[in-house]
């Protein structure tokens, strides 16, 4: 029995796909691994809030010696519901201009729970080819009919809708707003227009990599494209730009009530710690005031994207602070990431099955606490690699 697993691991090593948990020490925007201190080019802390000491101290000052509980000790449907949860949900619903919001323990919990709760045998789920693994897992758990449309190919999506609009009672179209591996953005206005032509269609959008970063108030790509009110299921996470933990859905009250009664990861999980939810509440209140951080991040991102195009003469799909350098070959990608780490940059290889075969890459993630000079030095390092 054990030999089977040993052989599977040996195969992963032979394919340069073997993963190990790293031993890291975090020092602000830097990572220390063994004796090597590196600029962290792989973080999801897009606004730099997780390392913002002034923000942290302001939070503690607000609560002083009345800090929220460190654990909920139960699911929300039993004894694990605290006032701060309702306060955050109300704050978010008001900010988004929607009826309600609902919190979850993580983005993964949200994506594996919402779709199975909403779907049944009379439902068809249609997903962009490159949606996140958590959404794929949620679709599998839904046990309903499922097809994919080609990435960003909304003509292909409409063909699928035309073919199936009289066969199913409801069709759920699923996409990310900012895609996690390429950093490219969905055209949500096109998706909304399609939804409006097909009354049985619901639109499910995951804003994990857009919340905090995009939009005038930092509410994501849906805010930036002016279509928050037209998206039925608007999902996002607190564990990236907001420097916290957990996730949310913005939706109508009837959807919230349905999820509270039907969503298994919500019903059967211990709720987030109240302390964590209080921190998220505090950070979310700051989002409208972080325009300077968003502008700085956008400037850094544009500069790095253009540099990669110029240096390596490769196409650049990204429109965000997620900047891929696609090498293709697994071994070459691993070697290049190691060379960058030796030069003082914590860059990680992304390989199949996380990305499609033949598209192994290094995904650079920029954060708003990086300095222009640091990104300039990194670009100079990339230039040396190319020579």
Swiss-Prot record:
It comes from the Bacteria. Catalyzes the decarboxylative condensation of pimeloyl-[acyl-carrier protein] and L-alanine to produce 8-amino-7-oxononanoate (AON), [acyl-carrier protein], and carbon dioxide. Its cofactor is pyridoxal 5'-phosphate. This is Putative 8-amino-7-oxononanoate synthase. Pathway: Cofactor biosynthesis; biotin biosynthesis. SUPFAM superfamilies: PLP-dependent transferases. GO terms for molecular function: 8-amino-7-oxononanoate synthase activity; pyridoxal phosphate binding. One of its GO terms (biological process) is biotin biosynthetic process. The gene is bioF.
């Amino acid at each position: 029995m054990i030999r089977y697993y040993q052989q599977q691991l040996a195969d992963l090593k032979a394919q340069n796909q073997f993963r190990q948990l790293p031993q890291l020490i975090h020092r602000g925007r830097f990572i220390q691994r063994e004796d090597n201190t590196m600029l962290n080019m792989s973080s999801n802390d897009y606004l730099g809030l997780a390392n913002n000491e002034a923000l942290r101290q302001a939070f503690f000052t607000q609560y002083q010696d009345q800090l929220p509980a460190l654990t909920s000790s139960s699911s929300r449907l039993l004894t694990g519901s605290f006032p701060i949860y309702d306060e955050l949900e109300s704050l978010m619903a008001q900010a988004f201009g929607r009826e309600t919001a609902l919190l979850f323990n993580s983005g993964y919990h949200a994506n594996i729970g919402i779709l199975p709760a909403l779907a049944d045998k009379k439902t068809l789920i249609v997903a962009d080819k490159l949606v996140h693994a958590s959404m794929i897992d949620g679709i599998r758990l839904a046990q309903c009919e499922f097809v994919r449309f080609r990435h960003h190919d909304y003509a292909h999506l409409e063909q699928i809708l035309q073919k199936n609009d009289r066969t199913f009672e409801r069709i759920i179209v699923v996409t990310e707003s900012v895609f996690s591996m390429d950093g490219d953005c969905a055209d949500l206005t096109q998706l909304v227009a399609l939804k409006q032509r097909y009354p049985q269609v619901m639109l499910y959008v995951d804003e994990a990599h857009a919340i905090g970063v995009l939009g005038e108030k930092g509410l994501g790509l849906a805010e930036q494209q002016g279509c928050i009110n037209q998206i039925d299921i608007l999902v996002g996470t607190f564990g990236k730009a907001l420097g916290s933990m957990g996730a949310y859905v913005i939706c109508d009250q009837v959807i919230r009530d349905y999820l509270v009664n039907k969503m298994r990861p919500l019903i059967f999980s211990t709720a987030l710690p109240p302390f964590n939810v209080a921190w998220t509440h505090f950070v979310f209140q700051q989002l409208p005031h972080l325009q300077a951080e968003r502008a700085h991040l956008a400037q850094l991102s544009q500069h790095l994207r253009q540099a990669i195009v110029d240096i390596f003469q490769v196409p650049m799909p990204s429109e965000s602070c997620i900047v891929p350098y696609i090498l293709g070959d697994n071994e070459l990608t691993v070697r290049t990431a190691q060379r960058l780490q030796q030069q003082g940059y914590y860059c990680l290889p992304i390989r199949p099955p996380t990305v499609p075969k033949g598209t192994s890459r290094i995904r650079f993630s920029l954060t708003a606490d990086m300095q222009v000079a640091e990104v300039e030095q990194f670009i100079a390092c990339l230039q040396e690699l190319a020579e």
